[in-house]
């Protein structure tokens, strides 16, 4: 019969973050051999991660960090809001975003191999997945380095960690403008920075839709060109950051606000859990 104490079970749980019953079973299977029990739990955790691979990660958090002209925005996903609101999962997010800040990549696959306190981000994700009993994965990653980078995080629920985040690179430092623009992006979700960034096929599709809709509405043939141009312009005002009405002063466009501040947006990223 295996010989071990309650203290052994507790120590194994603290080391592996596995459940009490799992720790007890592992010690029994290992005949009280502590190191073997650790190995058994790690194997079990890896198997459980494999079983969770097909599950959907519709919850999670968005984390951000900035330092000396470098900023990162990271999406860490899990299955349920129960796990998302837990301190262990949120600590994982903090560790991953710090790794992202010191790793020169915007590729999530590369970040997974980055080392944090002697362990890879991949190992941290898998260990927490095993401990929390849910599929956890690293989602999107943005990393900007420039004259000025500003981040903004927003909680969609007071009980959950931030699930909406924005990262903005400006052409020059301007804390007030950076904060205002980041909050605007969070609220209005622009898809493009300028009109020139909208792909030609997207514009062509909008023109076709506008023309077809106008015809269905019975608009006069001679009026179609003007109607189509008006609706395409409306599309730009809705989806292009610089052409949107500014959140804090709708009488101005974002471009006018940037001009007044003497800066321009170089690029931006906006992540919201559950949205592409």
Curated annotation (Swiss-Prot):
It is found in: Cytoplasm. Its main location: cytoplasm. One of its GO terms (cellular component) is cytoplasm. Keywords: Cytoplasm, Elongation factor, Protein biosynthesis. Pfam families: EF_TS (PF00889). InterPro entries: EF-Ts_dimer_sf (IPR036402), Transl_elong_EFTs/EF1B (IPR001816), Transl_elong_EFTs/EF1B_dimer (IPR014039), Transl_elong_Ts_CS (IPR018101), UBA-like_sf (IPR009060). Gene3D superfamilies: 1.10.286.20, DNA helicase RuvA subunit, C-terminal domain (1.10.8.10), Elongation factor Ts, dimerisation domain (3.30.479.20). Transmembrane segments: none annotated. One of its GO terms (molecular function) is translation elongation factor activity. Residues 80-83 are annotated as: Involved in Mg(2+) ion dislocation from EF-Tu. Belongs to the EF-Ts family. Associates with the EF-Tu.GDP complex and induces the exchange of GDP to GTP. It remains bound to the aminoacyl-tRNA.EF-Tu.GTP complex up to the GTP hydrolysis stage on the ribosome. This is Elongation factor Ts. It comes from Acidothermus cellulolyticus (strain ATCC 43068 / DSM 8971 / 11B). The gene is tsf.
